UniProtKB/Swiss-Prot annotation:
Cellular location(s): Cell membrane
Organism encoding this protein: Sulfolobus acidocaldarius (strain ATCC 33909 / DSM 639 / JCM 8929 / NBRC 15157 / NCIMB 11770)
Cellular component terms per the entry's GO annotation: membrane
Protein name as it appears in the record: Probable glycosyltransferase Saci_1499
Family per similarity comment: Belongs to the glycosyltransferase 2 family.
Alphabetical keyword list: Cell membrane, DNA damage, Glycosyltransferase, Membrane, Transferase, Transmembrane, Transmembrane helix
């Protein structure tokens, strides 16, 4: 095996496996961290402002959030809800006239006339209107348990936190969505690993867009959100850390709605890929110059590179497909690195399956959910690549809101599926030719890789 093949195998198998094993380690460490979630009583609570950006949201969803917030344990005289709308004037008026505000809540509705940026701009607008010493950002379809706020505040006080992150627990109102079941499992797994696991290792934590409580002073120091960038949470997180602010994990759940159809999943993941790359481009200097340890800096950068294993795998798989006509003379993937990748993937899958069963899913739903999520993730690799480099090369990108509910077969969706199908057939044809030439390992690998694309092309309609 030559140096080129060694490098190829390191990128294709070892590089993604390292990311997988790192997340496994963080998840296992998070399981050892016990967090007190008993409701605490405070007689002198600060004013808390909850900022909720909305656009084209169903009124029933807005009503559901307000009803949920009215049940939270907090001095309601010291609680204000700030809803920032980017809707047109007619729909905004309809919202105000239709929503029934619970009697004990103070709710302010604002419509942005001058729409600077997207979600980041809406959060900054809300921050400028807020009067609270604490600022909580939350999506309109997220929900909190009754003791969430007061427990989070207690930890902020006891651990001297400038911001505290709630633990993402996925939910879906679509009980028939196999994708949503897989998303619920992976969301909780990632949340435990990336928040509680990192805190246990004394690594730095990024805020999340829905479910972070900030001190007003911390936001003041960094001048709030930068409306020019798409990924509001990662963007502000780098500047908070640069300014020496402490972001903590609470271990307290917030229930966030997960995508329940292919197109919503596609929009969410491609936006996150673009956003993380955009932050990498614009905020890397803040990470490098932060007065934190080398390990902490590297971990923050690795988090922003979380989509690169998908990107590297796509490039190498495509390269392998195009190499065959040149008669390479040997099996390029016949390497022990493949075994390392298989073991890491097996461990990861077993942990996801175990978590799915703990969450109450039966074995069939668990396997189907994890499998469908995996296939969809692989199949959108070309679009992850495009959007990652789009974010890396320029700022001022468009924030596309994750659509909810039933999705129609639009021309855009059909184009996406067509592109997925073309790549799937390319990898399938290449796998057959590699096997025919006697390069069995590479051929089987490409057959495996093509299956995700072909599966999505043939079955995506079941998740619409």
């Amino acid at each position: 095996m030559g140096l080129t093949d060694i490098f190829l195998n390191l990128l294709l198998f070892v590089y993604p496996a390292v990311f997988i094993i790192y997340q496994i380690i963080l998840y296992e460490i998070s399981a050892r961290k016990q967090i007190n979630q008993e409701a605490l009583k405070y007689s002198n609570l600060p004013v808390l402002s909850i900022i909720v950006p909305i656009k084209n949201e169903e009124i029933s969803v807005i009503q559901g959030l307000l009803d949920n917030l009215s049940n939270l344990i907090w001095d309601k005289k010291k609680l204000e809800i700030i809803i920032v709308s980017d809707d047109n004037e007619d729909y905004f008026t309809k919202i105000i006239n239709t929503v029934k505000v619970p009697k004990d809540l103070t709710v302010y509705f604002y419509r942005r006339e001058k729409k600077l940026g997207y979600k980041s701009g809406a959060l900054q607008y809300g921050f400028e209107k807020a009067t609270g010493d604490l600022i909580l950002t939350i999506d309109v379809d997220s929900r909190l348990p009754p003791n969430a706020l007061i427990n989070a505040y207690e930890k902020m006080q006891s651990n001297t936190c400038d911001a505290i992150v709630f633990q993402w627990n996925g939910y879906s109102s679509n009980q028939y969505s196999t994708l949503a079941k897989g998303m619920v499992v992976s969301t909780l797994f990632a949340s435990k690993a990336l928040f509680e696991g990192k805190e246990k290792l004394k690594l730095k934590i990024y805020p999340v867009g829905s479910g972070t409580m900030f001190s007003r002073e911390a936001l003041r120091v960094v001048n709030g959100w930068d409306y020019r960038l798409v990924q509001d949470d990662l963007e502000i997180g780098t500047r908070l850390i640069y300014n020496g602010k402490n972001v903590c994990a609470s271990g307290i759940p917030i229930y966030v709605e997960v995508p329940d159809n292919f197109y919503s999943f596609y929009v969410q993941q491609t936006r996150w890929a673009m956003g993380s790359a955009e932050v990498l481009r614009n905020r890397l200097k803040y990470i490098i110059k932060s007065k934190i340890s080398f390990t902490q800096r590297m971990d923050l950068i690795i988090y922003l590179l979380q989509y690169t294993p998908v990107i590297v795998t796509f490039f190498i798989s495509t390269l392998l497909s195009l190499m065959l006509p040149f008669r390479i003379g040997h099996d390029p993937l016949n390497s022990p690195a493949l075994l390392f990748w298989l073991v890491s993937l097996g461990l990861y899958a077993s942990l996801l399956l175990s978590l799915a069963l703990k969450l109450g899913l039966n074995l069939k739903d668990s396997l189907m959910g994890i499998g469908r999520l995996t296939a969809f993730t692989v199949s959108i690799s070309p679009f992850i690549v495009f959007n990652f480099f789009k974010g890396l090369l320029k700022s001022g990108n468009t924030y596309v809101i994750t659509p909810k509910g039933t999705v129609k077969k639009t021309n855009k969706l059909l184009r996406i599926i067509a592109i997925i199908g073309v790549f799937g057939l390319l990898y399938l044809l290449s796998s057959i030719l590699y096997i025919y030439e006697g390069y069995y390992v590479t051929g089987i690998w490409l057959l495996y890789y093509s299956s995700a694309y072909l599966y999505t092309m043939l079955l995506y309609y079941k998740e619409l």
